[in-house]
From Swiss-Prot:
Organism annotation: Homo sapiens (Human)
Protein name: Protein FAM83F
Alphabetized CDD domains for the sequence: PLDc_FAM83F_N
Family of the protein in this entry: Belongs to the FAM83 family.
Gene Ontology biological-process annotations: signal transduction
Source lineage: Eukaryota, Metazoa, Chordata, Craniata, Vertebrata
The keyword Protein transport is annotated on this UniProt entry: no
Length: 500
């Protein structure tokens, strides 16, 4: 229950009357009624209401036009969901009168049915101390000849960023500043979060299209949009705008003021830019995270027609496992928080329409529809398990109770006599032994052969191996070696190579 309602329950509470002359004056019921007359009946009804309530005109002409343009009636979610589920034939029939919306079971819901967007790229952890607190004021035009202009101050902050870049702006169309942000995100791997006003998103996307960005350059950039607080009335809602403007870098520096990231603001208009450091940054840190939590996603990949990241397409069941913290211990590549839910939403949109059970579950609430969708996925959606790479070993075959690798099947024994200098060996004369002599008795048991009498090389065969090698001593400066690798008897000693 709201604090004002709790105060009304107190017997000793007396509502204090706040007049227009007091500084605490904020809300007036008579002005709200005049605003409803403006939105419902136009300028003439607004003037009549002011005369009836004996009020002075509290809205200027541009404000009246902007309020009428931002006003929109409420939309009933239940008839809209039913209309999407109907066929084209039923859509031609006259729609029935809208039913009254049912009351919610919870007057003050303590849990949202939407996912809170996470800061998946990371956030700076500055602790309790953020450095020395300083305040510096910059103006345009500069007061001092050597003072930097406002755009230079902003670009230097972005180019020196190492941890995180956070931007809150109502209108962002300066390509030079955004190019510095893209370079910081792509080259230095600095996480970038940008929050824009909903009305200024289309102009921001126009600037991005002119820069001809690629998918790998914006992977460390998250763009979201928010609206103003708004004004709610029984007949509709007036949508507000975002007027905050500040740039936070590394959690210890903030630039805020009237300066916006546009060419006109840095060359034509008069602006102020306040540079804050130290503990002065903490309120801006909190404000940015609160704005990010209520913001809506702006998909740059879809808006700019980019391919996006190439990843594996998991089913909904596997996706729920991968975002579980206990599976993160054994998963080699964990998706950022919230990525799987966005993937499920994209898959549903690509499928073309709502599931068959959505219309039936709409009457039971959002939770019933989610449960029904999950149970349906277990039966209908093919489960795709994450790929498992095999162990990089050679193919093994079973032979005589032992494992034999395929890499050793085609080995041939070296000839006992080295080829002659002219290359006319036994193989050239057609007198070479068949190749299967070695492979057929690779691991056969055989008695030891006596050592070669010449002492040049010895062939040793153990009980477990018959592999024979021709070994010798490396020739030195005083010894001579021929092309076969043999050395003189005076400098070579018998060497045995035993494989056990």
């Amino acid at each position: 229950m709201a604090e004002s309602q709790l105060n009304c329950l107190d017997e000793a509470h007396v509502n204090e009357k706040v007049t227009e002359a007091q500084a605490a004056f904020y809300y007036c019921e008579r002005r709200r009624a005049a605003l409803e007359a403006l939105l419902g009946g136009g300028e003439q009804a607004y003037r009549e209401r002011l005369k009836e309530e004996q009020l002075r005109d509290f809205l200027s002409s541009p404000e009246r036009q902007a309020l009428r343009a931002a006003w929109s009636p409420y939309e009933d979610a239940v008839p809209a969901a039913n209309a999407r589920g109907k066929s084209k034939a039923k859509a031609k029939a006259p729609a029935p009168a809208p039913a009254e919306s049912g009351e919610s079971l919870a007057y003050w819901p303590d849990r949202s049915d939407t996912e809170v967007p996470p800061l998946d790229l990371g956030w700076t952890d500055t602790g309790f101390y953020r450095g020395v607190s300083r305040v510096t004021l910059f103006t345009h035009p500069p007061k001092d000849e050597k003072a930097p202009h406002l755009k230079q101050v902003v670009r230097q902050m972005i180019q020196q960023a190492q941890k995180v870049i956070a931007v809150v702006m109502d209108l962002f169309t300066d390509g030079d500043i955004f190019q510095d942000i893209v370079d910081a995100a792509c080259k230095r791997r600095v996480p970038v979060y940008i929050i824009l006003d909903e009305a200024g998103v289309k102009y921001f996307l126009e600037m991005c299209q002119d820069l001809q960005l690629t998918d790998f350059r914006i992977r460390n950039i998250r763009v979201r949009s928010v609206t103003g607080v708004g004004f709610y009335m029984p007949m509709g809602r007036i949508k507000g705008t975002l007027s905050s403007r500040f740039l936070m870098v590394d959690g210890d520096k903030v630039a805020t003021g009237s300066y916006r990231f546009t060419w006109s603001s840095s060359h034509v208009d008069r602006n102020l830019l306040l540079l804050l450091t130290g503990q002065n940054v903490e309120p801006f840190d909190t404000e940015f995270r609160e704005l990010y939590a209520i913001s809506e996603e702006v998909d740059l990949y879809r808006q700019l027609s980019l391919a996006g990241r190439v990843g594996l397409h998991y089913s909904s069941t596997v996706a729920r496992k991968l975002i579980n913290p206990k599976y993160a211990l054994v998963s080699g590549c964990r998706h950022p928080p919230g990525e799987m839910m966005r993937w499920a939403a994209r898959q549903q949109r690509e499928a073309g329409g709502n599931p068959e059970g959505q219309e039936e579950g709409a009457s039971g609430g959002e939770s019933a529809w989610r449960l029904e969708s999950f149970l349906k996925d277990l039966v209908t959606v093919e489960q795709v398990l994450p790929p498992v790479e095999p162990i990089p070993l050679g193919e093994l075959s079973q032979k005589d109770g032992r494992m034999v690798s395929h890499m050793h099947r085609d080995l041939k024994p070296k000839s006992r006599e080295a080829p002659s200098r002219n290359g006319m060996g036994e193989a050239a004369r057609g007198e070479a032994a068949p190749a299967r002599r070695f492979s057929s008795r690779l691991f056969s048991r055989r008695a030891k052969r006596p050592a070669a009498p010449n002492g040049m090389a010895s062939s040793v065969s153990t009980e477990t191996s018959e592999v024979e090698f021709l070994t010798g001593k490396r020739p030195n400066e005083n010894s001579s070696a021929d092309i076969s690798g043999k050395t003189s008897p005076s400098s070579a000693k018998p060497s045995n190579c035993v494989i056990s």
